[in-house]
Amino acid sequence: MAKLSLRNVQKTYAGSVQVVHGIDMEIADGEFIVIVGPSGCGKSTLLRMVAGLETITGGEIHIGDKVVNNLEPAERDIAMVFQNYALYPHMSVYDNMAYGLKIRGMAKAEIAQRVNHAAGILELAPLLDRKPRQLSGGQRQRVAMGRAIVREPAVFLFDEPLSNLDAKLRVQMRLELKELHRRLGTTSLYVTHDQVEAMTLADRMMVLNAGRVEQIGTPLEVYSRPASTFVAGFIGSPPMNLIPVARNAGGDTGAQMRVVAKEGEAANATLGHLPMGLHLPEQALLGLRPEHIEPCAAHEAIAEVDVRVVEALGADSFAYGSLGGQAVVVRLDSHAHVRAGDRLPVTSSAEHLHFFAPDTGKRIEA
């Protein structure tokens, strides 16, 4: 195991197209880090630079105490698990897991010990004589992970390993990955576009957008205090509501705010008590998680939501509607009697209000 350091890491392609912009991160020995972001944000490129499959055009990558920029992948003491398994179809499960050790010249007894140990961890022991075509998708992915485990690397790299699995298998494999990391304690860097995977697996997560770091933190920190409107809209399902607001006429900094209605709409919403010490500009974006917009009695309401659609999902329901013409989502108790066409009185607590600068999208702190 080893710590992993990314220091001003950059990637520029021919024609001065920069796709990774000066990324810095210190990853502790044994930490599980998830890089999450939309397609094309640079997350797989960053992972491939750590692996040695892409050249680095700026900065340094340290694995342990070594700068690995110019080392071949085989010299970096890493093991990588890919999205598409990359198994040899003519080889058995045992031989797929053992192949990398064989070409390194390891003794047969040591290979057998490592393969059998990994197979026991991953519940693959009964399948060691099978070919990949005889396995389910989840079993194939476990073989790919077993092939990485037998190398006993300093760092595991995962490139969207669950993307090819169906929804039920993804949940199962998430749990298995979490348990595997708990048992092995190996430093891990995991790439995904799926924010649920990021939230459930990560010790800390890095949110990437267009090759730049938007935020680094624990899943709870990122969810509870998003650093930008991008993070607020990307992390969470449904995402955070973002509503334009303005200071009431005549109010000074920190005064009441009102929702800015779309033309021809009446917002009828004034935010009463803003968080202490919060200084807001004339215009801002208000962020509210769907679970923090609470249905209430009419006399307690700060706004009314015009409900268009209600989705019943069992334990929860979601009401999709508008507030002054601005789209909002409200999470409801499954027993709430709300229907399309209702005007739903709602309120919220000051500690659940988030504010962002409309020009930069950055969080406004108290």
Curated annotation (Swiss-Prot):
GO terms for molecular function: ABC-type glycerol-3-phosphate transporter activity; ATP binding; ATP hydrolysis activity; hydrolase activity, acting on carbon-nitrogen (but not peptide) bonds, in cyclic amides. It catalyses: sn-glycerol 3-phosphate(out) + ATP + H2O = sn-glycerol 3-phosphate(in) + ADP + phosphate + H(+). SMART domains: AAA (SM00382). Its main location: membrane. Its EC number is 7.6.2.10. It comes from the Bacteria. Gene3D superfamilies: 2.40.50.100, Nucleic acid-binding proteins (2.40.50.140), P-loop containing nucleotide triphosphate hydrolases (3.40.50.300). Belongs to the ABC transporter superfamily. sn-glycerol-3-phosphate importer (TC 3.A.1.1.3) family. The complex is composed of two ATP-binding proteins (UgpC), two transmembrane proteins (UgpA and UgpE) and a solute-binding protein (UgpB). This is sn-glycerol-3-phosphate import ATP-binding protein UgpC. It comes from Cupriavidus necator (strain ATCC 17699 / DSM 428 / KCTC 22496 / NCIMB 10442 / H16 / Stanier 337). The gene is ugpC.
